[in-house]
């Protein structure tokens, strides 16, 4: 055992999550591509279970986010280890938008729309990842994250109550009500309208209904916060925990009130509360 290994401190879970120790990404092997394959296979597996009756506890709506949201955050976390230059990020984002548009077209022009929605979801994740990571690189000082979080949370609240997100929520609720009725009656499910493709959906086992989870802005900010952790050497695992906690709270409230809830106030608020001392220290 060398001197470096002997002097290395063993961190407890509490210290990893709540100390201001930065968790560098250097010297590690990113598993971004294998994780993308795993994410897609799990998605397809849930999709295959859509036609299976009596799958028991899998019918519970909470199983979907319990699997999908941690996988999505981990996907952003791993791809965030591969920092892109500004030109590369713009190129990847444009390619992602093009691929998203192509798959959206085939969703509404072919009978096998579920296959194309799988690819559309991957394109949505790729585009939002590069957008969020690029925006994180444009932040000059860690303390600038504070007003960004405050403004983003306020805008999200107004959007969900009165703005575009409110309109999108109406479309989603209308589509889900029709889809649920069609499923109960044994009728085929129509493809989702174009606006619904701006949401991350996940197949719900035991039904043919796709469960909406997160919007474009939510996905961008997940990538943004993880990119900011990499850029300013903020505690990465703590940020991941806080993001998942915020997503979980917003989802539970949406389930309880049976209406769309703003996500950014929870993930932005928890991110600030957990990292405020570190943001001030690294900006001084």
Predicted feature descriptions by range:
Residues 12-284:
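A membrane-topology feature that recognizes alpha-helical transmembrane segments
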């Amino acid at each position: 055992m060398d001197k470096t290994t002997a002097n290395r401190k063993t961190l407890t879970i509490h210290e990893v999550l709540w100390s201001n120790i930065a968790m560098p990404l250097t010297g590690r092997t990113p598993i971004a591509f294998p994780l993308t394959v795993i994410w897609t296979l799990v998605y397809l597996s849930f999709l295959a279970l859509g036609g299976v009756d009596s799958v028991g506890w899998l019918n519970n709506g909470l199983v979907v986010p319990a699997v999908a949201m941690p996988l999505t955050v981990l996907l952003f976390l791993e791809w965030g280890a591969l920092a892109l230059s500004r030109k590369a990020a713009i190129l990847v984002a444009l390619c992602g938008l093009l691929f998203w548009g192509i798959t959206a077209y085939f969703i509404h022009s072919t009978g096998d729309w579920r296959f194309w929605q799988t690819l559309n979801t991957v394109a949505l994740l790729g585009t939002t990842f590069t957008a969020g990571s690029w925006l994180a690189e444009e932040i000059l000082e860690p303390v600038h994250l504070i007003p960004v979080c405050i403004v983003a949370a306020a805008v999200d609240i107004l959007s969900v109550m009165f703005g575009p997100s409110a309109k999108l929520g109406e479309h989603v609720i209308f589509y889900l009500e029709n889809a649920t009725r069609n499923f109960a009656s044994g009728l085929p499910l129509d493809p989702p309208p174009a606006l619904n493709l701006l949401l991350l959906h996940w197949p719900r086992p035991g039904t043919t209904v796709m469960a909406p989870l997160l919007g474009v802005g939510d996905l961008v900010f997940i990538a943004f916060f993880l990119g900011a952790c990499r850029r300013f050497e903020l505690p990465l695992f703590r940020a991941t925990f806080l993001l998942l906690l915020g997503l979980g709270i917003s989802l539970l409230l949406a389930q309880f009130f049976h209406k769309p809830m703003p996500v950014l106030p929870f993930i932005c608020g928890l991110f600030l509360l957990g990292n405020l001392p570190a943001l001030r220290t690294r900006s001084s």
